[in-house]
């Protein structure tokens, strides 16, 4: 091994725990230690500083304007706090402030995608939900018409995790837990009644895939009774899922993309298709039908032009279009 990475995707490691962990590891191994965490609890900066004082080699942090909550702890604040200490970073505070200011101006453009989480929440220690999932779960719950039961879904997330054996929750296993939690709230299921009420119910694809072994084998194995209920007699795999994949025909994919879509057949295009064939084909169809929206400013793409507003669209090197919305009228009969 060249490096030891500690991925705390839910931001569960507390400051003193980080100190103890890093000190213990430093006493046993000589390779660099890299700590990744999230700031959902509000303790992220303290956690990284304790880890730094214990000798961690690498930490992940985010520019202040993009930090906190389900993101990473605040880089600018850490740099300032470590100034004039043994672990001084050497990072120019003015330089990173300039970059942070840039992202502070960009962020409002994407405000529609922000979670409505306004403050850190120590309840993350209760639910153990990854940062990225925590920020997306509410909109997912609302899409099922269960927004008024969001707290019930969070409680069920914890219950499902315990039903599965307190598993490592990171994509895709965290999605399986979340989907199962929503499914159980939807169908008024509980850990106690699920074996009777869900005998003939089709479970979410993600939880079926989990119990099939397609996400790997969890430490301690699967809970057999629940596995049998979910799979309805289907036999799970016991090997590494990747061993069952057929050899990918990349030359064939490149030929398809060239002949069907007129692409260059680059390695990047072939990999995109191999990983997400439907998503990539839908993207190509969108380009063909609607054009390349990447040429348009994000604010215009999301919100459109206001009357009298002008935007510039660079469609090629040295070729720029100026678009102005003069006015908006009701459509006529034709």
Describe each model-derived feature in a short phrase.
Residues 1-33, 49-56:
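Alpha/beta enzyme core
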Residues 6, 34-38, 61-62, 90-101, ...:
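Beta-strand segments within the central parallel beta-sheet cores of soluble alpha/beta enzyme folds
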Residues 46, 71, 80, 89-146, ...:
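Core active-site phosphate/anionic-ligand binding loop and the adjoining beta-turn-alpha structural block
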Residues 8, 54-71:
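Glycine-rich phosphate-binding active-site loops on the catalytic face of alpha/beta enzymes
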Residues 118-121, 128, 132-334:
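Terminal or standalone catalytic/regulatory effector modules within metabolic enzymes
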Residues 7-11, 36-42, 64, 122:
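Active-site beta-loop-alpha junctions enriched in small/polar residues
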Residues 22-30, 79, 83, 104:
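Surface-exposed amphipathic alpha-helices with a cationic face
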């Amino acid at each position: 091994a060249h490096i030891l990475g500690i991925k705390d995707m839910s931001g569960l490691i507390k400051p003193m725990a980080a100190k103890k962990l890093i000190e213990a590891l430093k006493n046993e191994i000589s390779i660099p230690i890299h700590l990744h965490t999230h700031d959902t609890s509000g303790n992220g900066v303290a956690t990284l500083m304790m880890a730094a004082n214990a000798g961690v080699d690498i930490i992940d942090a985010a520019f202040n304007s993009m930090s906190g909550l389900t993101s990473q702890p605040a880089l600018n604040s850490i740099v300032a706090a470590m100034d004039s200490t043994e672990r001084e970073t050497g990072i120019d505070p003015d330089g990173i402030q300039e970059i942070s200011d840039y992202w502070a101006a960009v962020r409002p453009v994407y405000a529609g995608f922000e979670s409505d989480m306004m403050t850190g929440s120590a309840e993350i220690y209760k639910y153990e939900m990854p940062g990225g999932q925590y920020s997306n779960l509410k909109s997912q719950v609302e899409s099922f018409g269960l927004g008024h039961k969001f707290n019930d879904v969070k409680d069920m997330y914890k219950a499902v995790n315990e039903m599965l054996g307190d598993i490592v929750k990171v994509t895709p296993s965290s999605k399986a837990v979340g989907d199962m939690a929503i499914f159980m709230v939807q169908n008024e299921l509980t850990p106690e009644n699920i074996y009777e009420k869900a005998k003939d119910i089709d479970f979410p694809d993600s939880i079926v895939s989990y119990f099939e072994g397609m996400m790997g084998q969890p430490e301690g194995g699967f809970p057999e009774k629940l596995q049998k209920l979910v799979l309805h007699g289907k036999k799970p795999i016991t090997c590494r899922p990747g061993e069952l994949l057929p050899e990918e025909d990349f030359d064939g994919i490149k030929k398809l993309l060239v002949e069907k879509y007129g692409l260059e057949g680059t390695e990047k295009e072939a990999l995109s298709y191999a990983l997400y064939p439907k998503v990539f084909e839908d993207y190509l169809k969108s380009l063909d039908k609607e054009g390349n929206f990447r040429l348009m400013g994000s604010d215009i793409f999301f919100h459109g032009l206001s009357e009298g507003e002008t935007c510039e669209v660079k469609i090629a090197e040295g070729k720029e279009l100026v678009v102005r919305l003069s006015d908006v009228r009701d459509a006529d009969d034709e």
